[in-house]
C-alpha cells in the first residue's frame, strides 16, 4: 500500500479518471467497481471528458457500484442510481444498461438482494479496478466500524456520524436513510486493483490511521492492508502529518 499526496483534489481526481480511462481503453470488456459521494464528482467529470474526446466504445464495459441506500427507489434524486446516471451514464450515454449494476435498496426482500448482488459479483467478477472514498470514521463503502472483515454484501445500520455527514444531500437529517446495502469488506478485497481517494482536512485522521500499517476493525479501511495492490491518493489537506 502506498499513500501519495498529489497536492490538489482536482489533480488527484484527474489522475484517477485517467487510470479508469486507460483500463477501459486497453480492455474493452473491463469490469469497474464504482463509488459515489462528493469525492467522486470530479473523477466522473474528468472521465466523461476523456470518453467524449476519444469517443471510446464502452458497450462492453461492466460496472458494479459499492452500495445503495435502503428505502430509496432508483428514481429518487438522492439514490445512488440517480447519482451514477447524473454523473456518468447520462453524460456519456453509450454504456449498455444491462451491464450497469447497483444494489436495489428498495427490494421487497433485502436479504435476498444482498445474496443476489454478492452472487452476481462472484459470477462476473472480479473487478479490474475498484475505486473507493473513505469516511471520516474510516468506513469504506458503507462498512462501518466493527464490520466483520469477512463480510459479504450485507445490510448496514449507518452510524450517527455517517448519517450526519450525508445529511447535506437531503432537506434535513430526518430524511437521511438509516440503512444501506453495501458490498462487504471481503467483497471489496476481491478486486484486482484498488484505488482510494481522500480529500480535505476532515479525512486526515482516517488516512493517518490507515497509514499505521495494521488491520483494525474499528477502522474498516485498514482491511486494505490485506490486499496486494492498493493505491491511495490524497490532497495536501488529507495528507498524513509526519
Swiss-Prot record:
PROSITE patterns (alphabetical): GLC_GALNAC_ISOMERASE (PS01161)
Keywords: Carbohydrate metabolism, Hydrolase
UniProt keyword Transcription, yes or no: no
Pathway(s) this gene product operates in, as recorded in its UniProt entry: Amino-sugar metabolism; N-acetylneuraminate degradation; D-fructose 6-phosphate from N-acetylneuraminate: step 5/5
GO MF annotation, one: identical protein binding
Listed InterPro entries: Glc/Gal-6P_isomerase, Glucosamine6P_isomerase, Glucosamine6P_isomerase_CS, NagB/RpiA_transferase-like
Ranges in coiled-coil conformation: none
UniProt keyword annotation of Hydrolase present: yes
Reactions listed under catalytic activity: alpha-D-glucosamine 6-phosphate + H2O = beta-D-fructose 6-phosphate + NH4(+)
One Gene Ontology CC term in the entry: cytoplasm
Annotated active site: 67, 137, 139, 144
EC number(s) reported in the record: 3.5.99.6
BP-aspect Gene Ontology terms: carbohydrate metabolic process; glucosamine catabolic process; N-acetylglucosamine catabolic process; N-acetylneuraminate catabolic process
Similarity field: Belongs to the glucosamine/galactosamine-6-phosphate isomerase family. NagB subfamily.
The protein's role, per its UniProt record: Catalyzes the reversible isomerization-deamination of glucosamine 6-phosphate (GlcN6P) to form fructose 6-phosphate (Fru6P) and ammonium ion.
Name of the featured protein: Glucosamine-6-phosphate deaminase
Upper taxonomic lineage: Bacteria, Bacillati, Bacillota, Bacilli, Bacillales
Amino acid at each position: 500500500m502506498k499513500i501519495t499526496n498529489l497536492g490538489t483534489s482536482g489533480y488527484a481526481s484527474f489522475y484517477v479518471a485517467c487510470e479508469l480511462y486507460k483500463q477501459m481503453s486497453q480492455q474493452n470488456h473491463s469490469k469497474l467497481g464504482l463509488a459515489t459521494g462528493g469525492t467522486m464528482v470530479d473523477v466522473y467529470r474528468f472521465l466523461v471528458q476523456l470518453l467524449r474526446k476519444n469517443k471510446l466504445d464502452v458497450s462492453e464495459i461492466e460496472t458494479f457500484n459499492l452500495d445503495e441506500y435502503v428505502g430509496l427507489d432508483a428514481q429518487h434524486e438522492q439514490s445512488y442510481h440517480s447519482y451514477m446516471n447524473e454523473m456518468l451514464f447520462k453524460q456519456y450515454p453509450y454504456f449498455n444498461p444491462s451491464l450497469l449494476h447497483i444494489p436495489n435498496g428498495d427490494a421487497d426482500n433485502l436479504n435476498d438482494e444482498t445474496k443476489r448482488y454478492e452472487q452476481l459479483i462472484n459470477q462476473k467478477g472480479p473487478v479490474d479496478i475498484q475505486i473507493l472514498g473513505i469516511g471520516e470514521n474510516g468506513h469504506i463503502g458503507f462498512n462501518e466500524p466493527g464490520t466483520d472483515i469477512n463480510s459479504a454484501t450485507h445490510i448496514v445500520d449507518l452510524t450517527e456520524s455517517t448519517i450526519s455527514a450525508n445529511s447535506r444531500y437531503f432537506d434535513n437529517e430526518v430524511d437521511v436513510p438509516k440503512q444501506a446495502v453495501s458490498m462487504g469488506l471481503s467483497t471489496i478485497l476481491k478486486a484486482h486493483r484498488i484505488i482510494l481517494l481522500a480529500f480535505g482536512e476532515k479525512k486526515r485522521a482516517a488516512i493517518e490511521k490507515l497509514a499505521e500499517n495494521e488491520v483494525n476493525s474499528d477502522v474498516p479501511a485498514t482491511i486494505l492492508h490485506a490486499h496486494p495492490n492498493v493505491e491511495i491518493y490524497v490532497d495536501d489537506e488529507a495528507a498524513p502529518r509526519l
